[in-house]
UniProtKB/Swiss-Prot annotation:
It is an enzyme of class 5 (isomerase). The gene is tpiA. Substrate binds at N15, W16, K17, G178, S218, G239, G240. GO terms for cellular component: cytosol. It comes from Clostridium tetani (strain Massachusetts / E88). This is Triosephosphate isomerase. InterPro entries: Aldolase_TIM, TIM_sf, TrioseP_Isoase_bac/euk, Triosephosphate_isomerase, Triosephosphate_isomerase_AS. It is found in: Cytoplasm. Involved in the gluconeogenesis. Catalyzes stereospecifically the conversion of dihydroxyacetone phosphate (DHAP) to D-glyceraldehyde-3-phosphate (G3P). Its main location: cytoplasm.
Amino acid sequence: MKGVYGLRKAIIAGNWKMHNTIDESVKLVEELIPKVKEAECEVVVCPPFICLPKIREITEGTNIKVGAQNMYFEEKGAFTGEVSPLMLEKLNIDYVIIGHSERRQYFKETDQTVNKKLKAAFEHNLIPILCVGETLDEKENGVTEEVVSKQVKLGLFELKEEQVEKLVIAYEPIWAIGTGKTATSEEANEVIALIRSTVKSLYGDKVAESLRIQYGGSVKPSTIKEQMSMSDIDGALVGGASLKANDFSAIVNYK
């Protein structure tokens, strides 16, 4: 991907959500390793928490990076059922998805919670993938721009320039997640350009042009090539298609 200040390396991440036991996860990654070893983009898999230690172990020495799907913002304490950024850091996890629409929708995560998680991730050497996007109602009411730019501004509140440069943002229109509906490449690119413009207004040209922004929402082998040809799309956050080695490797090897 071409940025004004140099190349932005494409990043394609698979979000497995609440799928795959440890054995199933190992089988999937063992199938993936030879299929994606020549990939020109950065490849990330995000398995469920219990699978992270094993997946971290078997991806060692490969070009596959490992991400978590979520984390809490406190380092430790009486927070039953939560996983801390320190725990992920000690596992040498590379990335962490923050603010996924399912977290916002089902677990009532707010932009303020997302902001705390972003800060905690950076404190523990994790690169966050910040998810933003609008619902079908918001899209139909013509407030996509307002909703998405607000999520970006509140999510990035008080983050430093050097942190935002490392960050990945994923634009995932909520109406296109798991529905089989996909934003057209032009629609996705338009909103992603808006996200970049919002970051530019907060941090300036250099940061905005260095920042990688993915599209997420029913990404498939049949849609990826066109999506990746767009000027502002730097990668994909892949859901269902990341659970099949053939599909995910076809997406990763889109060129």
